[in-house]
Amino acid sequence: KGSIRDKFELVKSLGFQGVEMNSPSNINKEEAVKARDDTGIVIHGVIDSKHWQIRLSDPKPEVREEGLKYLKGALEDAKFYGADTALLVPGKVANPKTENFDQVWARSQAEVRKALPLAEKLGVKIAIEVVWNDFITTPDQFVRYIDSFQSPYLGGYFDCSNMVKYGVKPGDWIRKLGKRMVKFDFKGYSKSRGWVPIGEGDEDWPDVLAALGEIGYDGWATAEVSGGGEKELRDVAERMNRILQLS
């Protein structure tokens, strides 16, 4: 509840330094920028909120065209907010005949390439996120996908909780990605219990922190959680501080 300014003031009071915004969203962008300037909360990234439903890997060209429009919109919104990344899930392996791994790879690459000139013009990076889409499930695949674009305006958005499911330690994903990793987020995932609160999963945080140090990562660490009011956000902040060894 409350205005965007109220929300920014709340997260600021709890120790958060930045947030990400959805694109598109029903938030007034001018109000968000004013709240950013008034509170000092950084809008560090934008999330393409249509990438699951309107996929760049869809078998229908008209759907892919619409998905590209939303990706470009996310890049434009990121520039407006002063953010440096637009998060993108590039596709989903949804059908063995019409949307399989090879098709998702080829189609998503073709569409993302169309957005790279705009990303370069705006100075905003397309940040590819790894999720449960049955597409990129190993560090080697992630590296190969990113490197195939040969662009400084595309990198990896690594979710270390999502990838626990696939068997390779999050720290090893990070080491493999190296400087390709432009953003980093997490929640909490346990192999035996599923989604859990931050810090109660199987991420192996000492190893994750060691890996982040080894690759020289000093960017944003984002909690991808549902949030809530002051009580819930305070708990998130305390958990983040604990696992990141900030307190």
Where are these regions (language model features)?
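Active-site beta-loop-alpha junctions enriched in small/polar residues
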Residues: 22-24, 48-51, 91-93, 129-133, ...
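N-terminal pre-domain/capping segments
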Residues: 1-79, 103, 113, 120, ...
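Short N-terminal secondary-structure initiator segments
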Residues: 1, 27-41, 127-135, 161-168
